[in-house]
Amino acid sequence: MAKDIKTAAVLGAGSMGAGIAAHMANAGIKVHLLDLPLDEGDNRDGRAQNGIDTQLKRHGFQRPEYAKLVTPGNTEDHLDRLGEVDWIVEAVFEDINVKRDTFAKVDAHRKPGTPVSSNTSTIPLEVLLGEASDEFKRDFSITHFFNPPRVMRLVEYVEGPDTSAEVNEQMHHVLERQMGKVVVDCRDTPGFIANRIGNFWMAVGAKTAFDQGIKPEQADVAFGRPFGVPRTGIFGLFDYVGIQLVPGIWGSLLKALPSSDAYHDYNIVERDEFKTLLDKGFTGRTAESGFYRGREEVYDFAAGDYRPKEKFQVGKDPKELMESGTPEGDYAKEVFSTFIKYCCDTAPEIADTVDQIDIAMKLGYGWKKGPFELADSIGIDYVASLFDDAPSLLTAAKNAGGFYADGKVLGSNGELTDLPNREGVIRVAELVAGAEEIAGNDDATVYKLTEGDYAGFGVFVYKTPMNSNSNAVTELWTHAPEWDLKGLVIANDEERAFSAGADLGTLAKLSGPEGDSEELARTIKQGIDGLHGARVAPYPVVGAVRGVALGGGMELVLHTDASVIHAEARVGFPERNVGLFPAWSGPVRLLERLVDLGVPNPHATAFGVLLNVRPVPAVNVDFWREHDEVIQSPDHVVEGALELVKKLADGYTAPADVELPLTTGTLAYTDGSETDKAIGEALAKVFTGDGTATEDELAQRQVDAATEVLKRQENHDRAVSMATTRKPLNN
């Protein structure tokens, strides 16, 4: 059975190799990072050390201290370390001879059975292995990470015909569960999936723009937001990747693909525009400029110099854009139709199901929807109408009702098939299907599971946008002690948010000099009572936290017995932006934790945390408790929470109300406006005084202070601004 690994080695300390090593360290793996020795000076490990230092500067490590888990070395003096590790990754230069020489050294020094993988993005596995031993072939695979490894969740995995089942299982476990990646199993074809498809899209976008006389900034607007493409667009992405890589990456695919492949129709390597930029050294972010210089200038090939960017506007709907008859619409239609045709024509060669291509484009290139999902959302009949002779896979999708129809996905052979399952990834909608609804309202439902390993346990599911805490939600929580459950997990399928906070509309309506202060006080008290209900329920409550947990959502996390939290979840208290401080006993729970942890000056520390509006990655939070689990995979937080609540249920006793010390010290917010200072003064009233305060006394302090500060016109204006525009008002 696969298990977590403790040690690894990465050979090659460039941007990718050092990035992989850094993210291994994020996952708690001790890493040996090896590169060629420096010839001069005493520090022969300088290249590897430079790789570590670069990752520290680029925030490849989630916490700076994780860099201590990476030991630098070199490939002459330290190959013996390979015999100590559980996994070896090759990330050296994309040269077959260099890689084969590296593999020979690895095979001579590794423990028998140690998995070895290559991070190649261009060389087929069959070519890589060459004359490797049978034992090496059984332990070998390709693990193609995307840069930067901390951020990009996609890993393309290629197994060979001789790769053992044990190695495949182990690699999937480490990549998915331990390192938090989404593994797409690929065939051993040129460019695998993401670069084969993504590079083609970029080439089509560039060549079509040049041929149609579409300006770079015009192209990036046209095939940008309407299609769910990141704001870089196509030309901005070339700058980001580095234009100097075009001859190597795009050129290598041209050499690897047969002349019949449509890739050859979009040979940007030979385009004068790319040659011009390369000749001038305008390579994008690796230089001072590329297609763009800064944010306001773009290269004009006719003039041979940079000019101010022009402003172009298009609508949000891709179909309306493609039918608009405008230059932008005609360009977008040509790019999209060419791209979706290539995806359809290529799918049988590179993928088993179309969702593999969609996942690759979403996680490898940042698209909101993959090309096949996009085709379904635009309308499969319309997409088919773009062709006189539609690709066979597109015709199959039309006949099936879409690439995704009836809860299934189209295989690359044109047949509908079940969506593949990833081990340990639980969809809440499927989990609660058939479960008993024991409580709920329009904004949330509490389910009691009746079958399987989690029978008797409950799931709290929001139904509000971004899982916000409306009055109906907080009222529902007040009844938590009444629910007949073994334990409760707070979970949902909304990847963007555990809970984005309180219902801002209510605050905006009730606050201000003319607002209903009594109703405002009741609303705040109900929030306190609701979260208190979650805390004192006679069963454990566990949060499955991913996306964001902000404001009232983070206060709810603090009221759970424990949570399983994605390391990159953004957590914090932005209440100051809405004219308030966290007032649902978040201050109480945070102070309680800090006191229990023995933090010096806990009131001042809590004060600073509660008024810092900037969310931080959960991995950087220092007040998680013993039972809280911070993991790398957002897709496994639900499973983790269910397992944790089962463990906590045995012999569970609800926590008692607390009595906490107050402080006689000065707590003041001095950096902001008078409005910010007023919020700081209000929060200080909760924490300051002589002796101690009970839970009820602290609750009343919060209600009084929050109601008073929200009477101010300036604070009301902040609440209205956030509720109506989602933008903070710095008044």
What are these regions (language model features)?
Residues 543, 547-553:
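Gly/Ser-rich catalytic serine loop of serine hydrolases
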Residues 1-488, 493-495, 505-539, 549-550, ...:
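N-terminal glycine-rich phosphate-binding loop for ADP-containing cofactors
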